[in-house]
Curated annotation (Swiss-Prot):
Protein name (database record): Large ribosomal subunit protein uL14m
PANTHER family given in the database record: 50S/60S RIBOSOMAL PROTEIN L14/L23 (PTHR11761), LARGE RIBOSOMAL SUBUNIT PROTEIN UL14M (PTHR11761:SF3)
Cellular component terms (Gene Ontology): cytosolic large ribosomal subunit; mitochondrion
Signal sequence, renumbered to the chain: none
Keyword Ribosomal protein found: yes
Entry's localization field: Mitochondrion
Family: Belongs to the universal ribosomal protein uL14 family.
Native organism: Acanthamoeba polyphaga
Superkingdom assignment: Eukaryota
InterPro entries on file: Ribosomal_uL14 (IPR000218), Ribosomal_uL14_sf (IPR036853)
GO BP terms: translation
Primary location class: mitochondrion
Transmembrane domains' residue ranges: none
């Protein structure tokens, strides 16, 4: 579960490395956000690259929206089958719910693909 002030890894090539959660937007429960939920984040650390377009560049301190891709808590599927990840990861999205980066790094759970 992701709560406020949780530090998360960014799993796309938008330029951000670490982000911190500042608000839970579309949470499936009152306890915290899980896989597939939308949160508001602030960029804590980024990579400066010279070949990134200015529209796709993410700066430190910038507030963005993100969708949760993986959590350490995991996802329960039918038959008591749990899927867990080794880190909490997000992908940055814009106001039209399109990803800022052009690639997603690492596995993406099936629950995200069916809900979106």
């Amino acid at each position: 579960m992701i709560n406020v002030q949780t530090v998360l890894k960014v799993a796309d090539n938008s330029g951000a490395v670490f982000v911190s959660c500042i608000r839970l937007l579309n949470s499936s429960s009152r306890v915290g956000a899980g896989v597939g939920d939308t949160i508001t984040v602030v960029v804590k650390k980024n990579i400066i690259k010279k070949n990134i377009k200015k529209s796709k560049e993410v700066k430190k301190g910038q507030v963005c929206s993100a969708i949760i891709l993986r959590t350490i808590k995991g996802v329960k599927r039918w038959g008591n089958f749990f899927l867990r990840s080794s880190s909490n990861s997000v992908a940055l999205i814009n106001k039209y719910y399109l990803p800022i980066g052009s690639r997603l790094l690492g596995p993406v759970f099936r629950e995200i693909r069916t809900n979106l």
